[in-house]
Structures are given as C-alpha cells and as structure tokens.
Curated annotation (Swiss-Prot):
Binding site for Cu cation 2: 86, 130
Chain's role: Multicopper oxidase; part of the gene cluster that mediates the biosynthesis of aurofusarin, a red mycelium pigment which is acting as a mycotoxin. The first step is performed by the polyketide synthase which condenses one acetyl-CoA and 6 malonyl-CoA units to form the first intermediate, the cyclic heptaketide and yellow pigment YWA1. The C2 hydroxyl group in the pyrone ring of YWA1 is probably formed during ring closure by an aldol-type cyclization reaction.
Organism lineage: Eukaryota, Fungi, Dikarya, Ascomycota, Pezizomycotina
Protein name (Swiss-Prot/TrEMBL): Multicopper oxidase aurL2
Name of the gene: aurL2
Induction: Expression is regulated by the aurofusarin biosynthesis cluster-specific transcription factor aurR1/GIP2.
Molecular function (Gene Ontology), one example: oxidoreductase activity
Known EC number: 1.-.-.-
Protein's UniProt keywords contain Nucleotide-binding: no
Keyword Signal: yes
Keyword tags: Copper, Glycoprotein, Metal-binding, Oxidoreductase, Repeat, Signal
Consequences of knocking out this gene: Impairs autofusarin biosynthesis and leads to a yellow pigmentation via accumulation of the intermediate rubrofusarin.
Position of the signal peptide: 1-17
Pathway entry: Pigment biosynthesis
C-alpha cells in the first residue's frame, strides 16, 4: 500500500473552537450572493456569474487581529461555487480556503456557507476574493482590503483600489468546454480589459452605456494617494501608465509592505497586487491652468494581440473641466514592451521579522524542480495544429478539477482528517517530489524547500508566461531568469538583500517561439515548512484557462497527525466532511458551524 493510514488520534479542541448553529440570531459581517445574471460589460450584455449583482463585486474590508464572518449564498442554478480569499488562505478557518476538492467541498446550488477569516498583524494589504470553480473567476471577484490594526507603515491622504479584469463575450461554460474538448478550442484573447468594470474603449459621449467608458479616478491636488492595483484578469498581464505622473513608489506587493521602490509605470499579472504611492500635482499646476485631467493608458503584454483601454485621472477643482469628448488618437503614454525585468531583485520586505526568517541556501534541504509545458492527452500535433485534447502539465502530469470531480474525489484535507491518508514521502522522492498515487507533493515539517518552476515550450515550440500562485503561507521570491536555475549564482543576489514574501510571481517567457520541447526560463521560491503552515494547499498558474487545462499542483505540508491536530474533534467538524453537509445551510436548515477563532463568536 502506497499511502500511510494512521489510526484516529485524539484531538485537543475545546480551547480553540465552539460548535454552534448559525440561526437567525447570527449576523455575518458580510453577505455575498453568487448569481447568474445578465450584466453589461464593454457595452455588451453577457450572462455572467457575479457576487451581489455586479462585477466586480462589493469591496470587503477586514482588520488585523479581528475575526470576520462572510456568508456566501449559492443562487446559481445547477452550479457549484466557492470563494477563495486570494493571498489570505492561511488566515481562513479549516475547510475555508475555497479550493474545491483540495481544502473543502464546494457550495451546492441552493445552499450557503459561512467563511471565517482572521488576519494577523503583518497581513495589512491588498487582496481579492474570487470563485475557484471552473472559469467563474472571469466575472466573480471583488476587492479585499486588510486594514492595519496599528499606524500604517506609510502616510497617504487617500486610498484607491483599482481592480483589473478581462472581458470575454463568450460565456464561461462555452469557454471551459472548448478548453477541455477533443479537439481543443482556445478561448482567444479577451475582447477588452476592464478597470473597476469599465473597458475604456469608447469616449464618454459615444458610449451606449457606462460599461465601455473610461473609469474616472478622482483626486485632489497636493495629496498623496495609495493606488492599489489588484489584478483579477483571467489571462492578461497589463502595463499601465498615467499621463504626466511618472513618479510612482511601490510600497506593497501581494499583501507585504516593501521598502520604497521607485518606478514609472504599473505592471500587474493575474493574481498579483501592488500598491503605489502617487503624489498629485499642486492646485496651482492643475486648477490654475487649462489641464486638470490626465489619461491613464493600459495595454496587455506577452500575448499574440495587444488589448488596450483608457481610464482618466480627474482633479477636483473649483472650475470643473468637462470630460474629454473623445479618446486620444495616439496614446499620450509610451509603455515598454519589456516585462521580465519589472521589479526583479528590487523589492525587499519592510518586516524585520520576516527578513530575519529568510532561510539561506545552506539551510535548503530539498529542491523541487517542476517543468511546465503543454501535452496532448489525445490526438497529435500535426502541421502546426494541436489536434486533440490539450493539457498543461507539471513534470508531465496535469491536475484538472473536472477530472478529479468525475472521479468523485474527496477533498485532500478531508481525506487526511477522516482516514489519515497522506502522500507517500518516500515514493515522492523517487518521482521528483510528486507522489503519483495521491497526485500530491508532500513536505515534512522542518524542511526548507526551493521550488523551481521551469518554462518549457512543449510540442508547439511556443512559450507562454505563467503567473504562479501559492495558497497558504507566502514564499520568499528568489527571482527569475532565462535558461535554468543555478542556485549558487542566484544566491549572490541575497548577500545584502532579502527578498519579499509573495504569493503570485511570473514565470516569464524570453522568446515567443523556438525549437520544440526546450526549457528556457525559471522562477524560484523558498519556503520553510513549520507547524504554522501545515495543511493541504494548491500552487497553480493564475491564468484561468491554464488552470482549467491542468496547470495546478496540490501540496501537503506535514504528516497526518500534525495536520489533524490542527482541527477540532467531532462533532465540531462533522458537517464539513460531506458534500452539502450540515455546515452548509439551506432555506430550511440552519448550518452547524465550527467557530474556529475565539475573539468573536456571534
């Protein structure tokens, strides 16, 4: 037998859990309703899965050291849904990461689930929430801001979240079916890129409705603003510049405060978040003259076609300037085509605690190298055409949500909890870190891993870029480069520099096309496995199409005894162990919920 089965172990639960029915007296802090609605995006009606009727959904505000309850209703006919708290996986209660078939069962149609989240000191920053089922993320997302419990690390006068999204005219189901079909059908590029739901493709006076107008960012003169760029795009990496406002300072990346880093433009990929400080012009400069409005230009990068749009930075002046009659004939901002050098080896964490905890190369116990490329699971590549079923694979092995669902897979975390089933560590060492039986990567508490993603161009010879995202605790981002990873050479960067903790960084491409099956490009992470980050976590490409096609991995940190010791004993968790169990409420049945954190029990 290739799995280890451990006998049920005693649990110490009472100290950190209460088992309660969430009846009519329970009042969640936020309510999200997932529905299938016809909404206008890019001035076209689209049947879309949304939260609370809009895309993006409402902004959620959390605070460090406070527990927040968020109730999610699934009112989508015949569809599951989950919500993933992107960048805050480690702060969600057990069975609440939002990853179906990994950390929890999805929420069935007609039911609801109460998510419990508690950020800690050091988590203040920019995040977002989104569905983690199929292609739903393309419209089912919203901003999530964690506020500082203490005085913020940087001073600013205003705080402006800006969510970036992709717009596809085709509906989710059509796109997903094409990606999984035989023969495979690619989704194509998005029809538009949106900021705060606006595509910026039409002028204020020509647009049939506001959804294709530029989004307007209102500012006051002589102030400093924190611009939080949050990318919920399905596919697009964007470059963005603000006319006549090139002096930006990065102060945060993926929820981690950074030492200030000067830059003249924004670059953000699916799943990434950056905060930039921008000082506005004086009142004399803008309100005393004839120009108080400035174009914001954004363009996609590293894709076959450039998708672009505009937003507008508008100053508040006593003399109100009318909105521009038309979009610029030529862009007033020139954006670089170079992507792979953006802030590489430039972002150092502000947290002295995290900087001191950075493991050196001499502490690394194991390096796991994962080569990413396309494979054909049926058919063949003939005359430049992928004629068959296409998957994205890690070391030759795809992980597809639909395949696992068809196999009626029980979520990994629940398998561990109920049966003590964990990946076989010895077998994994024989297969480049991967256990082929459980289809998971195991790691032991005490290990320090270097995880190296390699970009291979597969049978077509074409490279893509991949924004790689880690669930659970963030990783020290070791940088990236062309060719393959050389640990000794790369470690030289860290003699007087400590990389910041991140959860989403790019595996870049360094050429468009080359000799097939060639590896050129790497991204490396470092993580220490401790008692704090034990659990079952995903690491995957945050391009939604690639994840649907199999570019995902599951990691199990810790052994069964350690993982199960993190959970309360039955009956506290009984309702989480089956699909639609008693932890999932209905119109007629109130849920029985494990209140995991102790500072707030409604």
């Amino acid at each position: 037998m290739l799995f280890r089965f451990l006998a049920l172990l005693p649990f110490v639960a009472g100290a950190f859990a209460e088992y309660k029915v969430h009846d009519d007296t329970f009042k969640p802090d936020y309510v999200l309703e997932a529905t299938l609605d016809d909404i206008k995006i890019n001035c076209v009606s689209r049947s879309s899965i949304v939260f609370n009727g809009t895309s993006p959904g409402p902004t959620i505000y959390l605070q460090e050291e406070q527990t927040t309850w968020i109730r999610v209703y699934n009112k989508i006919p015949d569809n599951n849904v989950t919500v993933h708290w992107h960048g805050l996986s480690q702060r969600a209660a057990p069975f609440s990461d939002g990853t179906p078939l990994v950390s929890q069962w999805p929420i069935p149609a007609g039911q609801f689930f109460d998510y419990e989240i508690r950020p800690e000191i050091g988590d203040a920053g920019s995040y977002f929430y989104h569905s983690h089922v199929g292609f739903q993320i393309v419209t089912a997302f919203g901003a999530l801001i964690v506020r500082d419990a203490r005085k913020p690390e940087y001073k600013y006068d205003g705080d402006i979240p800006l969510l970036v999204g992709d717009n596809y005219a085709a509906e989710d189901e059509v796109i997903e079916q094409g990606l999984l079909a035989d023969p495979f059908k690619w989704s194509g590029e998005p029809q538009a890129i949106t900021i705060q739901g606006n595509s910026g493709n039409k002028s204020f006076y020509e647009a049939p409705d506001s959804s294709c107008m530029p989004h307007v960012v209102h500012v006051d003169p002589g102030k400093t603003y924190r611009l939080r760029f949050i990318s919920a795009t399905a596919l697009s990496m964007i470059k963005l510049g603000i006319e006549d406002h090139e002096n930006l300072t990065v102060i945060e990346a993926d929820g981690s405060y950074t030492k200030p880093a000067k830059i003249d433009h924004v670059q953000v990929s699916p799943g990434q978040r950056y905060s930039y400080l921008m000082k506005t012009k004086t009142s004399k400069e803008v309100c005393g003259g004839d120009k108080s409005q400035y174009w914001i230009r954004y363009e996609s990068r590293d894709r076959p076609k450039v998708i672009s749009g505009y937003a507008l930075l508008k100053y508040r002046c006593d003399k109100n300037q009318k909105l521009p009659k038309s979009l610029p004939e030529t862009s007033p901002i020139e954006l670089s085509n170079s992507t792979a050098d953006y802030l590489e080896y430039a972002l150092e964490g502000l947290s002295e605690k995290n900087n001191q905890a950075f493991p050196k190369l001499s502490e690394v116990t194991r390096t796991v190298v994962i080569q990413i490329n396309q494979i054909l699971t049926t058919g063949a590549y003939v005359n430049g055409t992928l004629n068959g079923t296409v998957a994205w694979a890690q070391n030759g092995l795809p992980w597809k949500e639909n395949v696992q669902a068809e196999r009626r897979q029980v979520p990994y975390l629940i398998q561990i909890y109920e049966n003590g089933t964990t990946p076989n560590y010895t077998l994994a060492l024989e297969h480049h870190g991967f256990d082929p039986e459980t289809k998971a990567f195991p790691a032991k508490v005490g290990e320090v891993l270097d995880i190296v993603w390699e970009n291979n161009n597969g049978p077509t010879g074409g490279w893509d870029y991949h924004p790689m995202h880690v669930h659970g605790y963030h990783v020290y981002d070791l940088g990236s480069g062309n060719g393959t990873y050389n640990a000794t050479e790369n470690e030289a960067h860290f003699e007087n520099f400590t990389p910041v903790l991140r959860d989403t960084t790019n595996l870049y491409r360094y050429a468009v096309k080359g000799v097939p099956h060639h590896t050129a490009g790497w991204r490396a992470w470092r993580i220490r496995i401790t008692e704090e980050n034990i659990g079952a976590w995903m690491m995957h490409c945050h391009i939604a199409q690639h994840q649907v096609m199999g570019m995902a991995t599951v990691w199990v940190f810790g052994d069964a005894e350690q993982i199960r010791g993190k959970f309360p004993a039955p009956p506290y968790t009984q309702g989480y162990l089956t699909y639609g169990g008693s932890a999932y409420g209905t119109e007629d049945d109130q849920p029985w919920v494990n209140e995991y954190y102790s500072d707030k029990n409604n």
